[in-house]
Amino acid sequence: MSLTVGVVGGCGHVGLPLAIALAAHHEVRIVDIDLDAVARVRRGEMPFRDAGADEALGEALRRGMVVSDNPEVLRECNVVIVIIGTPVDEHLNPSFTVFDRLLNQLHEVLRAGQTLVLRSTVYPGTSERVQNDLRRRGLQVEVAFCPERVAEGVALEEIRRLPQIVSGFTPAGVAAARALFAPLGVELLELRPLEAELTKLFTNVYRYINFAVANQFYMLAAEWNIDFHRILHAMKHEYPRAAQMPAPGFAAGPCLLKDTMQMSAFNNNQFFLGHSAMLVNEGLPQFVVNRMLRRWPDLMTKRVGILGMAFKAESDDTRESLSYKLKKILSLVSGEVLTTDPYVSDPNLVEESRVVELADLFVIGAPHRRYRELDLKGKPVVDVWNHRGAGSVI
């Protein structure tokens, strides 16, 4: 069954790949307040990197996908998908301000019989909170929570391949969620809304904790001047029970830390494992700088180049990137910090060739593929990731 589907926040890293995927099966209307992104998407330009999305965007537009900054286009939609999560505030507690503001805007265009699908990660109980809010406003709108579980950069590919979790408070809400995703041809997993909310949070927190384990092991080994990557290889080689151990590196981005803190808040801040993971992962940049100061006591006389400012490899997304935290710390203890990234738009970045020429030493901030073979003129490289294969001891 073909639906008319609205995607609020549809020009972002989560919303646009979803809109493109759904446009092959439904009539899709994107709404976004980012006027620059709206203009670019209308022209058929992806505002960010995502594998296979450039051509697919063109196909979606040719199918009639609407891209607008006007919520009025949502009035005739059967399903309205919201790509807005619950952020954390300055105290690392969940903030509902964005959601409340959105509902104040949407209630003017929502109508009885529609289904509102929450797609982004939310604090547990948010779906029910939204449903109750709509009921208080007299809107008989179904609410479903169907979390995204994609990795940035390959979102479109994963939407077409991964099982979709669907949940709702009524049979009608669940049926609408199923009708939305069934044409993708993937498996549908039905849960209750709170179960679905926790599934997404547990998944992200599990990953964050795993990264913390690897980073803690790396720091322990480094204190004894041992290359943890040699140990990691021995742990994982032909040994299935350690196969899932990640490599060390900056665990960052818009989700993992935020969701770990939301999980803690949900459990009355009794989440010591999550707090420990936060201390390890957020402390890695300071650990790296401390090791650099031991190796180069004259660091204040040196110019340091950071290669890669995105929060992960092959990405242009700098949200919560620990490379920027590293830059701030290094700026206090080194002569100068130069930063570069081939994918990131930032007026403070320096051309890669200039950084290679001017820097006395380098730190791999994001392990973009190009840095593996980049000629760094024999200068020292701090490489927690062991991206260049020369070891990670600082």
Language-model segments: which ranges?
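Structural/interface elements that position substrates and couple domains in central-metabolism enzymes
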Residues: 1-394
